[in-house]
Structures are given as structure tokens and as C-alpha cells.
Amino acid sequence: MEKIFIEIGSCDFDTLNHFANEGWSGFIIDPMKKYLNNIPRKEGVQYLPIAIDHVKGERIIHYAEDNIVGKDKDFAGMSTFIPLNERNWGFRNVEGGKIDLLSGEMLIQTDTFRNVIRDYSIERIDFLKIDTEGYDFEILKSFPWDNVLLRPKIIKVEHFHVVNGMSEITKYLEDRSYHVYAEVHDLYA
């Protein structure tokens, strides 16, 4: 039986794309077309230029512009729904205030987790990876947990940019009978 992955939040340097080399099929979901289009295409992998959200529609995303990425490659592909006044990361303190390192804004397409699963006839998920710079827990909570057959076998979710992320996400996953292992930036369940 073929294995299925879903990766929400990607870039062009740290993806699950290589799983296709081992016979997996999957979905790489990221609204930043500039980086999504740089990922080499693999048979059996769908590349969706959207963001997962609570509703289908459009939304402003904040991202690191090229001048920031040119100085610090760690910001390549970094984007978030969370505005500067609601986050404690992604800025540099300067005299008199803050410089937002995610100052670019773009209107992007959104869709729900449930819609993507329905539209692409996804019947199982072997590996779910979520890395969305602070919106990770919201996406995890939007998963259709009522469908027991879809329950991901393995989950990797970033907690680093979520306020109280490690404890809240750990409890949420444990409440769904997962065993959770924590690393500095990510949780595995």
C-alpha cells in the first residue's frame, strides 16, 4: 500500500519531496509560489499554492522580502498570518522600536484542511508535517479529527513560533492518544 504525506508550509530547501523517491505520494502545500515553484517536481506529489486556514478565501500573509533573505538565508520562505504586534519573533530591535523582518505583504488563496482532503480524495495520511511560523497549532486544530481513518500515523509540527506552543500542542496531541517527543523547534507525535 502506497504511503501518503501532507506537508503544510514548505520552502525549497527542507521538504518531504524526497519521500517520492521511496514510493510515497503526497501534497506539498505552501502559498509562497516563488519557493514552491523551485521544488523539483516528483511523480505522485501534488504542489498546492495555497495556505490552510479555517475558511476558503483570501488572506494577507506577511513574508521576508528578498533584501532580508539576502542577508539571512534562514528567512527564505518564511511567512506568517500573524502580524508584528501579535508575535514575539521575526523582528529586530532598534532604537525607537522594532524593524519587522517579515514586512512584505501579499494576498494569497486559502482553503480548509477538510476541503483539500475532500477535493483530492485523500483517504489516509501516514505523515503530516506542519511548519507555518506560528499558525501551526491553528492548522492542527482544524484537522478533521472526527474522521478516524484519516488520523495521521506520524505528525511533525513546529512549536517554536507558537506562544506556549510546546505545552499546548503537546497536551492537544496527547488528548488524541499520541505519544509526543519534543525537540527545540518541533514536536513529533
Tell what function each PLM region has.
Residues 1-189:
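Phosphate/nucleotide-binding beta-alpha loop and adjacent structural elements of enzyme active sites
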